[in-house]
């Protein structure tokens, strides 16, 4: 009984530790989004690269249409 309880507590602790580490390891991304009616990501990625965004971008589809979001290398100035 004690072994099972210890295993459960240890497993739970390791899972929480992994969740905390994974959130710390992935920095927040910043995007410059333009509503252009995109449908797929490849044309949007090429558009972002041609506009000077080295990481490209992705097309996000919302209820009001497609939005091309270019990946910024750092947080934009306010």
From Swiss-Prot:
Cysteines joined through disulfide linkages: 33-70, 38-59, 44-68, 48-69
Lineage: Eukaryota, Viridiplantae, Streptophyta, Embryophyta, Tracheophyta
Keyword line: Antimicrobial, Disulfide bond, Fungicide, Plant defense, Secreted, Signal
Main location: secreted
UniProt similarity note: Belongs to the DEFL family.
An annotated GO BP: killing of cells of another organism
Leader sequence residues: 1-25
Name of protein: Defensin-like protein 90
Originating species: Arabidopsis thaliana
GO cellular component, one term: extracellular region
Annotated compartments: Secreted
């Amino acid at each position: 009984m004690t072994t099972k309880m210890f295993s459960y507590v240890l497993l739970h602790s390791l899972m929480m530790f992994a969740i905390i580490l994974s959130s710390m390891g992935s920095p927040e991304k910043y995007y410059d989004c333009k509503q252009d009616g995109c449908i797929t990501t490849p044309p949007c990625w090429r558009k972002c690269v041609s506009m000077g965004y080295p990481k490209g971008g992705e097309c996000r589809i919302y209820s009001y249409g497609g939005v091309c979001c270019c990946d910024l290398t750092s947080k934009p100035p306010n």
